[in-house]
Amino acid sequence: MKLFKYITIAFSSLFMCGCSDYLDNAPDDTLTMEMVFNDRTRTEDWLSGVYNRIPDNYWDLLKVWGYDSMGDDLDPSQRWYQWWGNSLNFIIGQWFTSSTWDAAIWSANPIRIRSAYLFIENAHALPDQGVSEANIERMKDECRFLIAYYYWQMIEAYGSVPFFDGLADVNDPNLMRGQMPFDEMVDWIDAQLVDLSKKLPASYLNESTQFYGRATSIMCLAVRARMLLFAASPLVNGNEWYAGFKNYDGKFRFSQTYDPAKWKRAADANRELIEA
């Protein structure tokens, strides 16, 4: 009987030790920034998450709620009404101030941008895990590209947008700010892409396949060329429809006069892309 008690106590002790070890493990949803960026796999996962949030232009701009569909014939017929009803209503003029819309890029891209800024601020070299300072700098440059790209998507869709050149502080009294003028946004994105086109590799052909699809200097030049062409177009280059559109500080959100020099700037950017 005593032997049975001793065996029971011994097994109970082992079981409790095992439970203690299991319960002491912190779940993933309580990870801190320090825990994430002190680990190579989690650091790389964070960067992948910034990439993974790249939206699909078709579904975020044109889809069921997309106002682009009002001027686009690339839309299903009446037989598709049960799936594309809202877009069809927009096309035939059945839309009102109360019509629904999808915030899509407006609400999601600032989250994507903040995620990239968090990486830039917190990521650091992990030499004991095979992550050099050069590796980290390239990954941060990739985040800078994604920030520029996400902002480009926003101004393409909405024109003038709120802008943060870094992490937004929730205690900042200027957190709720007006929209930065369209041309100023273009200039900022342009400067970022020009700088990054000199830092990022042109391709990853000699790298592991895990780098396929990552930001390159060619991507920088391509986004820049497309953006500057858009910025030169009559839609945002002296469009009289935007006359008088101002922020609370009195700044015009869009250029009030047509500037033909923007076409030259766009042409030069596209030539640079072609010759790259």
Predicted regions and their residues:
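Bacterial Sec-dependent N-terminal signal peptides
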Residues: 1-28
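Acidic, glycine-rich segments characteristic of secretory precursors and extracytoplasmic regions
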Residues: 19-72, 118, 183
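Acidic/histidine-rich, surface-exposed loop or edge segments in extracytoplasmic proteins
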Residues: 26-32, 90-100, 249-250
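Conserved, well-structured interaction surfaces
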Residues: 44-58, 80-158, 173-209
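Aromatic-lined, polymer-binding surfaces characteristic
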Residues: 147, 151-156, 160-167, 210-222
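Short coil/turn linking the two alpha-helices of tandem helical-hairpin repeats
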Residues: 153-157, 162, 204, 230-239
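Short coil/linker segments at helix-helix boundaries
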Residues: 160-179, 235-265
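Polar, glycine-rich mid-to-C-terminal structural blocks
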Residues: 230-232, 259-276
